[in-house]
Structure formats: C-alpha cells, structure tokens
C-alpha cells in the first residue's frame, strides 16, 4: 500500500465527478456540429463542442493526476484495475479499426457495379505509397523506438534521457500529423462520391486522430516528467500512453 494513501484499504473510492457527463454532452454537441458543418459549412456549433471536450479533458487529466500523485489513491491494487481498463479500451479500439478494414476489403475484393466492378474505381488517382505514406510509416516506427528509449530511461531512474526521449517522440508525432494534413490537402479525391474515398479517409483519418491524441497524452507525460512525477515503480500514466502509441504502430 502506498504510504501516501490516507485510507485503511488499498481501494480507491472515487468522489463524484462532473466530467463524464460534461464529456458526453461535449461529444454530442461536437458530433451534431460536425454534421451541420458537413451540410452547411457552419462551424460555430462544432467549435463549441470541441472547446467543451478540450476543457473537460484537461480537467479530468488534472483530477486523475492529483488523485494518483498527491493524494496517493493509485495503490498497487488500483493500478492493476487501471491496467485492466486500459487493456480493454485498447481491445475495443482494435475492433474499431477492424470494422474499417473490413469495409475496405469488402469493397475491394467484391467491387460492385456502381463503381464499375473494378477496384480502385476508374476515376481514382491513387497516392504514391513510396512518398509521404512511406515517410509517415518510418516516422511512426521511429517514434516507437524513442518512446521505448524513454520508458527504459524511466525504469532505470534516468530522468534526463526520459525527457529527451519524450521530446523526440512528441516531435515525431507533430511531424507525422503535419505530413498527413499535407497529404490530405493534395489528394486528388474527396471523402464523398465513392466508397474508396469514404473508407480511405475514415480509416486513415481516425488513425491520424489517434496519433494526435497519443501525442497529446505524451505531452502531458512530458510535463509530468519535467515536474518529477514519475518514479521507476510508479508511472502507469506513462505506460498507458506508451500502450496507446503501440496500438497506433500496429
């Protein structure tokens, strides 16, 4: 049991929190706003929803850090539960991407008459996989190396190399996102109009979104590392972010 835990047991009895409800409200507003934007180019509702989600994410991160770092609630038993929870979350994310790959392979292996019974559709100009896609793949693999370097430095108590590894990983994540935005801006096909564009942008777009979220998580870990929060035997927040990044690499 953590010496900082004020309770007489190893379990964390969480206090009432407004963030789950506010997060769901923000996500609902964001989704409705996105639909309105797709149909009318009106951004204001989507931006309101996005602002709510960002605010709730920050506050929720803050509360969890306070509970684990300052109040001592993240005992070894609690950390086991957190690991189970993160494992199940990653499993659900794998199934999410399986759905999009399923849609892609269903459309490509059995092309319908609506697209000329050929794959890809005849009017599609494919991206060269040996240019930006290859560069971004190498960037992801390199980021896996740097986050592993940071993790080994953490377990060995080397705070300097931990921070260096996280800086490198965050930088690579930002570069990846920049390349993907450039790729989308110069693509010759749109999201709507055919199944190829829909499956391409949904699968790669959600992958890019996960890279962005992983980068945000690592920025939080970087700030906490600079503040001296992580210890060799107490750093599940870092582990969770590294696991999430491993999902992206797959």
Language-model segments: what does each one mean?
Residues 1-87, 91-94, 98-134, 141-167, ...:
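Membrane-interfacial helix termini and the short, flexible loops that connect transmembrane helices
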Residues 248-250:
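Conserved small/polar residues in nucleotide/adenosyl-binding loops
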């Amino acid at each position: 049991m953590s010496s900082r835990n004020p309770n007489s047991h190893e379990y964390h009895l969480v206090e009432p929190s407004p963030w789950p409800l506010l997060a769901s409200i923000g996500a609902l507003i964001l989704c409705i706003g996105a639909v309105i934007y797709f149909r009318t180019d009106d951004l204001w509702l989507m931006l309101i929803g996005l602002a709510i989600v960002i605010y709730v994410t920050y506050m929720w991160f803050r509360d969890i850090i306070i509970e684990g770092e300052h109040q001592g609630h993240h005992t070894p038993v609690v950390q086991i539960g957190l690991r189970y929870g993160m494992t199940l979350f990653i499993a659900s994310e794998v199934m999410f991407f399986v759905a999009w790959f399923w849609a892609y392979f269903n459309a490509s292996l059995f092309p319908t008459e609506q697209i000329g019974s050929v794959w890809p559709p005849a009017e599609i100009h494919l991206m060269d996989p040996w240019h930006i896609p290859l560069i971004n793949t190498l960037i992801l693999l390199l980021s896996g190396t740097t986050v592993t370097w940071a993790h080994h430095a953490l377990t060995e108590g080397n705070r300097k190399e931990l921070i260096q590894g996280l800086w490198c990983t965050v930088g690579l994540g930002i570069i990846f996102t920049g390349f993907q935005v450039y790729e989308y801006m110069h693509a010759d096909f749109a999201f709507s109009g055919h199944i190829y564009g829909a499956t391409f942008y949904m699968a790669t777009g959600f992958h890019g979104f996960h890279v962005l979220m992983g980068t945000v998580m690592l920025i939080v870990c970087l700030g906490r590392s600079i503040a001296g929060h992580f210890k060799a035997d107490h750093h599940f927040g870092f582990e969770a972010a590294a696991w999430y990044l491993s999902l992206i690499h797959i």
